C-alpha cells in the first residue's frame, strides 16, 4: 500500500467529520505526583497485591499511583495471567494502565521480535500510549517501544524495525497494515494483541477490515484485550469474535454518566453571543487548564486567535495542521506552557492532560457519546472538574436532552455564581 493511501485512510478514520474534525483518542494516563487528588478507589489494596515486577512497582510509585482504580482492581489480576479481556469503563479510570502494566509484567524481551501490538484509532492516542509504555518501563532498560502512524515517513518506520526492532509496537491500523504487508513488521511472534477505544475501530467497516487482516497475521495463541469508555451492546459480539472466552468487565454501563466530581451545566444563548459569554466566564472562573471544543477547523482557528487577542493564553489543535505540529502543540499544552486549548473532536477522546479542570462545549457535540468523551477531559483521575455546554438552537437542546436521558444525569442551567471548591481542588 502506498504511503499516501495509508495517510488518506488514516485521515478518513480519524475524522468522522461533520464539516469538521472528529474522533480524538481513548487512553487513560496515570496521574503524576504534582496532581492534587489521586484515583478515588473503594479498594484499599495497593498495586503490590498484584505481585508485579519490582521494576514496575518502582515506576508506579514514581507516577504517584497509590491505590488501583476500580477498573484496575477488576482487570489487572486476570490480565497478568494472560486471559482475554473485554473492558468498558468510564473515561478517566485508568484503562490504559491495565494493559500497559499487564503486558510489561508478562513481557520477556527477545531481540528482534515484536511481542506486543497495541492499536488505536488516532495518531495522538497512539503517541500518548507509547509515552505511557515508556513511563512504566522506566526501570526496564531492555524493553524497546516504538510508535507508528500515518502522516510521518514510512521509511523511518521501516528503518526502526530493521535496525532497532521494538518489543512493543503501538500504532494506527492503516500504518501497521502497510508495514506488515511490505514485510517490514513481522507479527508472527505477537503474544499480546490490544485494541484501545475498540468500538471506534470496529464500528467503521474499513478500519475493521484492516484490524481483521492484521489479526490474521498474528499467531492463533495470544492474549487479546479490548478497552473502551463506550461499548454498545451491538458492538460487543463483534469484539468477542476476536477472543477466546474473555473476561468481560463493564465497570459502569452506558446508562449512567457518573463522572466523579464533575459539575455539568448549560448556558442558553444565541450563536453570536458565545464569544462574549466565553470571555466573561474565563475571567471569573478559576482554572488550571481549559479545553474548549468547537465543531470545525475554521471555528477552531478563529476562536483561538480571538482568545489570544483578548490576552488569553490559548493554543489550537485541529486536523488541518501537519502531524508534527499537532503533537508539538499537544505537548506544549501538556507541559503547561499554554493554559487554554481550542480543539475539534480530534482531541475529544481519552487524551489525558491531568491539569484540565474545565471543559467548554462552545459548539454542541453531535451525539451523546461525543459529549461523554469531551466532558471527560475535565475532572480526570477522580479530581474535580466543570463542564459547561452552550445551547444555541433546538437541535442543541435535543442533544442535551438525549445526554440527560441516556446517562440519567441532570444538567442544570449555569448559576450566576459557582462555589470554587465544587470544581477545583483546594490547596491545603
Curated annotation (Swiss-Prot):
Segments carrying motif Q motif: 45-73
Keyword Glycoprotein: no
Entries under SMART domains matching the protein: DEXDc, HELICc
Biased composition (Acidic residues): 1-19
Keyword Ubl conjugation part of the UniProt annotation: yes
Recorded domain comment: The helicase C-terminal domain mediates interaction with ALYREF/THOC4.
Full protein name: Spliceosome RNA helicase DDX39B
Protein source organism: Canis lupus familiaris
Gene coding for it: DDX39B
Amino acid at each position: 500500500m502506498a504511503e499516501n493511501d495509508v495517510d488518506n485512510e488514516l485521515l478518513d478514520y480519524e475524522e468522522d467529520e461533520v464539516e469538521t474534525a472528529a474522533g480524538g483518542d481513548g487512553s487513560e494516563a496515570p496521574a503524576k505526583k504534582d496532581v492534587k487528588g489521586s484515583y478515588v478507589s473503594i479498594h484499599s489494596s495497593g498495586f503490590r497485591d498484584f505481585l508485579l515486577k519490582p521494576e514496575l512497582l518502582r515506576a508506579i510509585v514514581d507516577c504517584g499511583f497509590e491505590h488501583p482504580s476500580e477498573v484496575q482492581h477488576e482487570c489487572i489480576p486476570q490480565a497478568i495471567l494472560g486471559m482475554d479481556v473485554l473492558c468498558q469503563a468510564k473515561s478517566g479510570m485508568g484503562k490504559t494502565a491495565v494493559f500497559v502494566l499487564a503486558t510489561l509484567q508478562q513481557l520477556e524481551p527477545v531481540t528482534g521480535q515484536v511481542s506486543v501490538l497495541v492499536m488505536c484509532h488516532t495518531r495522538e492516542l497512539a503517541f500518548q500510549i507509547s509515552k505511557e509504555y515508556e513511563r512504566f518501563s522506566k526501570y526496564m532498560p531492555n524493553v524497546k517501544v516504538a510508535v507508528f502512524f500515518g502522516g510521518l515517513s514510512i521509511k523511518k518506520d521501516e528503518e526502526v524495525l530493521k535496525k532497532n526492532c521494538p518489543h512493543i509496537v503501538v500504532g494506527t491500523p492503516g500504518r501497521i497494515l502497510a508495514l506488515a504487508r511490505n514485510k517490514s513488521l513481522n507479527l508472527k511472534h505477537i503474544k499480546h494483541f490490544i485494541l484501545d477505544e475498540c468500538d471506534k475501530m470496529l464500528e467503521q467497516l474499513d478500519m475493521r477490515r484492516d484490524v481483521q487482516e492484521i489479526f490474521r497475521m498474528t499467531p492463533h495463541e495470544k492474549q487479546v484485550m479490548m478497552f473502551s469508555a463506550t461499548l454498545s451492546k451491538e458492538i460487543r459480539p463483534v469484539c468477542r469474535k476476536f477472543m477466546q472466552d474473555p473476561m468481560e468487565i463493564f465497570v459502569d454501563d452506558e446508562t449512567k454518566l457518573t463522572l466523579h466530581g464533575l459539575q455539568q451545566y448549560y448556558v442558553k444563548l444565541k450563536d453570536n453571543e458565545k464569544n462574549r459569554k466565553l470571555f466573561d466566564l474565563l475571567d471569573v472562573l478559576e482554572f488550571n487548564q481549559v479545553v474548549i471544543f468547537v465543531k470545525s477547523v475554521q471555528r477552531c482557528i478563529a476562536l483561538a486567535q480571538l482568545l489570544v487577542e483578548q490576552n488569553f493564553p490559548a493554543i489550537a489543535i485541529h486536523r488541518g495542521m501537519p502531524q508534527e505540529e499537532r503533537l508539538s502543540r499537544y505537548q506544549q499544552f501538556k507541559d503547561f506552557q499554554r493554559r487554554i486549548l481550542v480543539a475539534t473532536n480530534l482531541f475529544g477522546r481519552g487524551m489525558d492532560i491531568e491539569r484540565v479542570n474545565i471543559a467548554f462545549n462552545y459548539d454542541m457535540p453531535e451525539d451523546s457519546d461525543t459529549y461523554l468523551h469531551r466532558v471527560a477531559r475535565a475532572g480526570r483521575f477522580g479530581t474535580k472538574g466543570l463542564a459547561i455546554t452552550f445551547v444555541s438552537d433546538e437541535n442543541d437542546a435535543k442533544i442535551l436532552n438525549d445526554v440527560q436521558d441516556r446517562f440519567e444525569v441532570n444538567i442544570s442551567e449555569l448559576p450566576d455564581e459557582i462555589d470554587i471548591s465544587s470544581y477545583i481542588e483546594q490547596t491545603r
